[in-house]
């Protein structure tokens, strides 16, 4: 697998409202652990849309790993121009910091937000252009990642497209391992 799309919950879906929330350490650690396994198997790129939450945290985790894995690249392909336009300032700063370090950055539709169709097009593009999907998602705690997951499941039915999860149980294990 060369290209891995990553998505997951937005911060509010996880009850995270501050960028210094202790939970972020464990979320990023769980993401890093999964990325390292993929890197050892030949992963070259992670693909995110720059969405707040898991996607930006995954990019930050990837940037941390680039010291040890300098060939790992991050692509940020937004569904439309200025997706951060109405975000709060700390969120904009985090987003801009992620974009500044990205190896590739583009906007899929080359227009500002017009309709939910742009998100659907983004999901399809990500699944079409990647070799697998990693989600921080628990099907028992439904949230925004369900749309990308649905697109991935349709492709999996056609060609076996791999879908990987980081679940709430995985996060608990990460916390427990760190406690020893």
Curated annotation (Swiss-Prot):
It comes from the Bacteria. PANTHER family: UPF0398 PROTEIN SPR0331, UPF0398 PROTEIN YPSA. InterPro entries: YspA. It holds the Pfam family YpsA. This is UPF0398 protein YpsA. NCBIfam families: PRK13660.1 (NF010181). HAMAP family: UPF0398. SUPFAM superfamilies: MCP/YpsA-like. Belongs to the UPF0398 family.
């Amino acid at each position: 697998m060369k290209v891995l799309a990553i998505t997951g919950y937005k911060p509010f879906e996880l009850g995270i409202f501050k960028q210094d929330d202790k939970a972020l350490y464990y979320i990023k650690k769980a993401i890093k652990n999964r990325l390292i396994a993929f890197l050892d198997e030949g992963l070259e790129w992670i693909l995110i849309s720059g969405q707040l939450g898991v996607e930006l945290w995954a990019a930050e985790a990837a940037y941390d790993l680039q010291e040890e894995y300098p060939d790992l690249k991050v692509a940020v392909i937004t569904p439309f121009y200025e997706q951060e336009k109405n975000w709060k300032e700390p969120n904009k700063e985090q987003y801009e910091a992620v974009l500044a370090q990205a190896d590739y950055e583009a906007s899929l539709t080359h227009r500002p937000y017009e309709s939910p169709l742009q998100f659907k097009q983004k999901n399809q593009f990500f699944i079409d252009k990647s070799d697998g999907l990693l989600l921080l998602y628990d099907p028992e705690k439904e949230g925004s990642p369900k749309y990308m997951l649905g697109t991935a499941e349709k492709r999996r039915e056609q060609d076996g497209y791999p879908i990987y999860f980081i679940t709430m149980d995985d996060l608990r294990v990460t916390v427990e391992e760190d406690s020893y």
